[in-house]
Amino acid sequence: MNKAQGTIVSAISGYYDVEIENEVVRTRARGVFRDRKQKPLVGDRVVVQLDNQGMNYLIEILPRTNEIGRPAVANVSKVLLVISAVEPDFSLELLDRYLTFFAWKNVGVVIYLSKADITPTEKLKAIKCKLDYYQKIGYSVFEDAEELERQLPTMIQKDQIWTLAGQSGAGKSTLLNKLENEANQETGAISTALNRGKHTTRQVKLFKYSSGFIADTPGFSAIDLFKIKVDELENYFYDLKDASVKCKFRRCQHIKEPGCEVKKLIEEGKIAKSRYDSYLKIRQEISENRMPEYLKK
């Protein structure tokens, strides 16, 4: 019997399909995982015991870097965040919530502005102006679908797992279908309809894309930030965090403290006021353990 390492690409009814060196092997999990109350997840890096008789067993789950989403995906390297310009309308507040959540999960984000082609010129110009700030603080921003599709294969590095996120109706499913169809054409695989209904619950799977994977999942249409500690929130606003090293007080929370570098840079226009407003709003929600307004609708 041989052992090999691979990545779980799908899981259904107690079986786990594991990609090992570009081949997919079907496995069963050993009972030891159940005893440990440990459940293998799509995205897990695992050790498989290979049997010439076709009885392959998953025997070890390697340490996870993270676990996000419902259904959960393990070891997500980056998130492609789909934010619409219209239908639904562009929201800086929602954008900041997503960025905060994924910063907390230690996952990088690439921003894609969808529906730019059906957005009135002046409105689109104003949105692009706002997104310029996010590029300045280190986020990659795409406003053109064709440009995104051209660059994505080189952005997804070997064995990385990417997933999509964004508000409902932003166009995640459309983009995901397109990317999966392209990947299937490249590999010669047969694509089946994804059958995404408004309330459809599906199994997560990974499909090969470039030298990594993209998770075929409904993504994250609603997030909550209640588990973040209030005094750690600034760590997930990278622009505020960078400025805070010059604050007079080491644990400055940028509220009423004297000598606050963050508030100084906001007044000078070097930090976007909208970012600070998002910080204060999320901070208040966490403090009060209160549901955000957009989740009440």
Swiss-Prot record:
Domain CP-type G: 65-223
Pfam families referenced in this protein's UniProt entry, alphabetically: RsgA_GTPase (PF03193), RsgA_N (PF16745)
Cofactor requirements of the protein: Zn(2+)
Listed EC numbers: 3.6.1.-
Enzyme class label: hydrolase
tRNA-binding recorded as keyword: no
Keyword Aminoacyl-tRNA synthetase attributed: no
Chain residues that bind GTP: S114, K115, A116, D117, G166, Q167, S168, G169, A170, G171, K172, S173, T174
UniProt-annotated binding residues for Zn(2+): C247, C252, H254, C260
One Gene Ontology term from the biological process aspect of the record: ribosomal small subunit biogenesis
Highest taxon above the source species: Bacteria
PANTHER family: SMALL RIBOSOMAL SUBUNIT BIOGENESIS GTPASE RSGA (PTHR32120), SMALL RIBOSOMAL SUBUNIT BIOGENESIS GTPASE RSGA 1, MITOCHONDRIAL-RELATED (PTHR32120:SF11)
Name of protein: Small ribosomal subunit biogenesis GTPase RsgA
Organism: Lactobacillus gasseri (strain ATCC 33323 / DSM 20243 / BCRC 14619 / CIP 102991 / JCM 1131 / KCTC 3163 / NCIMB 11718 / NCTC 13722 / AM63)
Gene: rsgA
